């Protein structure tokens, strides 16, 4: 049966760089690897073809020979101008995958036949807590509850009943994995007898069935530090999933989510708010009373002639800087409110005010219309 073109197998052009070939193989190998397709013979054959293609195209000498002679370069026919590479693919899957994936497949993260596999470490866990802005300002202790694997109290995580000892697995001889030869290729898989442990417990703990861990509810009191922001995480070492047979436990990551505040918005340690003021206060100036996140009230001066969009700054009236004694600032943005539903007398007074000749009274609008007049004058002159 004729072989598929190596370039077509990997989905790359004949001018592909080594990086492009490596990237293409990585993508295809993840899809067809036997560990991700258990019992799928078609996927296994596809994976063999991909690995053979990669082994040839990633090597400059082999690739040059393949480009010149095609598959004949590897049939041992050197006398006919071929190129003998000991049947083409001479490598080991684990060599390729260690190079590409750092031992993620086959070798079980580097725990191959050189030594017995250790117990699998517990997974890290995530827990989200929702707090108020005031909680972030003051700091808080938050009770949390979650269900996960915890160390078995009966066997203290060993998986053995009483003083029972473990014996070496006769299938993998303590390696934790077994290798099978299929044609040119060597495939390494986790030992199905000992599940990669390399040893078998003679008398398993009845409570945990030899795993050294059981599912249970965990209750903790988490300290939320002052100044924490949404998306910040708190790491609790060893509070994640318990490891298999006494292996290292995972960590717990508590993520904070701060509720939307009815008055303040936040950017880092600084707080922002928008305050509407009367037109007369903006024009004449004065003072307003402003609440702070710490529960106090502050008298704030509004300068004469304030405009919408002007900002007033209150130093160190913002949020605490996390793990520091400093605080951010509070910014008050002014919005000048236009009066509505005026009485007849109020309208007359406003009209009288507007009729008073004072070019400096409304500098923005006066300056704007002067620019408009100048604009039209320039157009007409052209």
From Swiss-Prot:
GO CC annotations on file: cytoplasm
Required cofactor(s): Zn(2+)
Keywords per UniProt: Chaperone, Cytoplasm, DNA replication, Metal-binding, Repeat, Stress response, Zinc, Zinc-finger
CC cofactor note: Binds 2 Zn(2+) ions per monomer.
Zinc finger residue ranges, CR-type: 139-217
Pfam families associated with the record: DnaJ, DnaJ_C, DnaJ_CXXCXGXG
Primary localization class, coarse: cytoplasm
Residues annotated for Zn(2+) 1 binding in this entry: 152, 155, 205, 208
Span of domain J: 5-70
GO annotation, biological process: chaperone cofactor-dependent protein refolding; DNA replication; protein refolding; response to heat
Residues where Zn(2+) 2 binds: 169, 172, 191, 194
Membrane-spanning parts: none
Superkingdom: Bacteria
The keyword Chaperone is assigned to this record: yes
Single annotated GO MF: ATP binding
Cellular compartments annotated: Cytoplasm
Annotated NCBIfam families: DnaJ_bact (TIGR02349), PRK10767.1 (NF008035)
Record note on domains: The J domain is necessary and sufficient to stimulate DnaK ATPase activity. Zinc center 1 plays an important role in the autonomous, DnaK-independent chaperone activity of DnaJ. Zinc center 2 is essential for interaction with DnaK and for DnaJ activity.
Family matches, as HAMAP family: DnaJ
Family note: Belongs to the DnaJ family.
Known partners and oligomeric status: Homodimer.
Protein name, as recorded: Chaperone protein DnaJ
């Amino acid at each position: 049966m004729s072989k598929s073109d190596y370039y077509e197998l990997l989905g790359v052009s004949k001018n592909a760089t080594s990086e492009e070939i490596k990237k293409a193989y990585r993508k295809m190998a993840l899809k067809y690897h036997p560990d991700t397709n258990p019992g799928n013979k078609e996927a296994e054959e596809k994976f063999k073809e991909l690995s053979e293609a990669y082994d040839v195209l990633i090597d400059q000498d082999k690739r040059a020979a393949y480009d010149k002679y095609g598959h004949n370069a590897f049939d041992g026919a050197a006398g006919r101008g071929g190129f003998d590479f000991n049947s083409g693919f001479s490598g080991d899957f684990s060599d390729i995958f260690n190079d590409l994936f750092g031992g993620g497949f086959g070798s079980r993260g580097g725990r191959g036949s050189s030594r017995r596999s250790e117990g699998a470490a517990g997974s890290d866990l995530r827990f989200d807590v929702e707090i108020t802005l005031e909680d972030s300002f003051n700091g808080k202790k938050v009770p949390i509850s979650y269900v996960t694997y915890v160390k078995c109290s009966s066997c203290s995580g060993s998986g053995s009943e009483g003083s029972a000892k473990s014996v070496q697995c006769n299938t993998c001889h303590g390696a934790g994995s077994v290798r099978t030869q299929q044609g040119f290729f060597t495939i390494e898989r986790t030992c199905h007898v000992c599940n990669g442990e390399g040893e078998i417990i003679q008398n398993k703990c009845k409570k945990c069935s030899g795993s050294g861990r059981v599912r249970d509810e965990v209750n903790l009191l988490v300290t939320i530090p002052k100044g924490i922001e949404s998306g910040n995480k708190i790491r609790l070492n060893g509070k994640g999933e318990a490891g298999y047979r006494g292996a290292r436990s995972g960590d717990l990551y508590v993520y904070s989510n701060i509720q939307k505040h009815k008055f303040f918005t936040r950017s880092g340690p600084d707080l922002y708010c928008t305050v509407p003021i009367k037109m007369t206060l903006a024009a004449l100036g004065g003072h307003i009373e402003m609440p702070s996140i710490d529960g106090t009230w502050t008298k704030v001066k509004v300068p004469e002639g304030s405009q919408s969009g002007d900002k007033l700054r209150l130093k160190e009236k913002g949020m605490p800087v996390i793990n520091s004694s400093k605080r951010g600032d509070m910014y008050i943005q002014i919005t000048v409110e236009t009066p509505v539903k005026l009485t007849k007398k109020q309208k007359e007074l406003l009209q009288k005010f507007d009729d008073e000749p004072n070019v400096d009274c409304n500098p923005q609008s006066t300056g704007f219309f002067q620019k408009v007049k100048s604009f039209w004058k320039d157009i007409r002159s052209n």
